[in-house]
């Protein structure tokens, strides 16, 4: 087990999984079986020691889709969101256009219901540099909440 787990996991929806991987996902990670990146969220939380941190950048879909409701419940009821930057599309100039919408976050492997995390909504930025500038400005102005 690890004090810190950091990942930018691969994305693979159920349609891209072969039969063996799909069956394993349904059995091992029923709350996140819809995409490989979501299984990585759960696995990384399992790999972190109590009080350890999990830092990831993933697709944003787990925050909104009903298929990830149980995953969200696990995160909110068993862990703590320390910080989150909702990046949306165009977070990486090397990935052109609106190919993937992302979120970057740090979770603590401990439940602290009264903890107030730092949250940034950067979806309106149109480039990697613009999102970075928005983030630096928000933090400097104390708006990361």
Residue spans for each PLM region:
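Polynucleotide-recognition surfaces of large bacterial nucleic-acid defense/processing enzymes
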Residues: 1-3, 79-85, 90-145
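Conserved Class I SAM-dependent methyltransferase catalytic core
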Residues: 11, 30-89, 104-105
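Short, solvent-exposed loop/turn and secondary-structure capping segments
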Residues: 14-21, 65-69, 116
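Short acidic (Asp/Glu) and glycine-rich catalytic loops that position anionic groups and cofactors
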Residues: 19-22, 50-53, 83, 143-145
């Amino acid at each position: 087990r690890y004090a810190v787990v950091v990942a930018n996991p691969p994305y693979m929806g159920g349609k891209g999984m072969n039969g063996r991987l799909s069956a394993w996902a349904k059995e091992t990670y029923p709350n996140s079986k819809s995409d490989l990146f979501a299984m990585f969220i759960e696995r990384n939380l399992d790999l972190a020691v109590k009080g350890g941190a999990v830092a990831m950048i993933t697709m944003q879909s787990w925050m909104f889709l009903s298929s990830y409701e149980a995953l969200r419940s696990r995160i909110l009821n068993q862990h703590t969101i320390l910080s989150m930057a909702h990046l949306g599309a165009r977070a990486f100039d090397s990935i052109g256009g609106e190919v993937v919408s992302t979120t970057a976050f740090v979770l603590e492997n401990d439940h602290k219901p009264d903890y107030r995390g730092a949250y940034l909504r950067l979806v309106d930025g149109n480039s990697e540099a613009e999102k970075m500038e928005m983030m630096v400005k928000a933090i400097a102005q104390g708006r990361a909440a």
